[in-house]
Amino acid sequence: YLSGEAFAALRGHTILGRTMREGPNDTAAFDRGLARAADPGHLLHHLFGVRALALFGALGEAEGASYLSGLLIGHEVRAACAGDGASVHLIGAETLCGLYARAIAARGAQAVVHGEEAAARGLFRLSAEVNWQ
């Protein structure tokens, strides 16, 4: 998925970004985005709604980026996660894994966070088992 790249492009190079300002993650706004992603409808329709919410004052400048993040991550998780209670393993930065874990939990699955060092540990174990010549 290209959720991070889509977020950066939408935030930095579209009219949506003009309604947002930099700031810390707003958990309530992120959760609103997650909830909207769970509603019927497609991503483009929901993205149009971000602009409408901002224009009508229902989404403040400080909340916009977190809402957009929740919307994009929510759509990604909705597409990838069946919500059948299965575990989803996450590898990455703690903050980003936390957001994904929140979205996965909202879909009824369990996130297992391994952290940033998991890839390096896996490569090390693989190198120990493979005879490199």
Outline where the language-model segments fall.
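Short hydrophobic/aromatic-enriched beta-strand-loop microsegments
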Residues: 1, 101, 107-117
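Flexible, glycine/charged-enriched surface loops at secondary-structure junctions
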Residues: 63, 87, 111-114
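Glycine-rich phosphate-binding loops at beta-strand->alpha-helix junctions
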Residues: 85-103
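Conserved active-site and cofactor/substrate-binding residues in soluble primary-metabolism enzymes
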Residues: 1, 5, 42, 64-75, ...
